[in-house]
Regions:
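Flavin-dependent oxidoreductase catalytic cores
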Residues: 1-81
């Protein structure tokens, strides 16, 4: 359950350097969570390298899972989803 109805919708942050979650991206979403939103969503991501539209865009692949887990755990630590 969300703690409230405030949701930060996905927007292109341009913080996925090397197409992987960066510390800057984690810090940004952590700050949003700390600010009280119920849920924050990370920007759109490519599911294949050929789907990348921009530098700084997430590319979903196995090796970025630890970075996404770090971001998720940090957001959850402040009560957001």
């Amino acid at each position: 359950m969300l703690r409230n109805r405030v949701i930060r919708s996905a927007a292109f942050e341009n913080m996925a350097y090397g197409n992987s979650p960066s510390q800057e991206l984690t810090d940004y979403h952590t700050a949003v969570a700390r600010g009280g939103v119920g849920m924050t969503t990370v920007a759109y991501a490519a599911v294949a390298e050929s789907g990348l539209s921009f530098d700084g865009q997430l590319w979903m692949r196995e090796e970025i899972v630890p970075g996404l887990r770090k971001l998720t755990d940090s957001v959850h630590s402040y009560g957001a989803k």
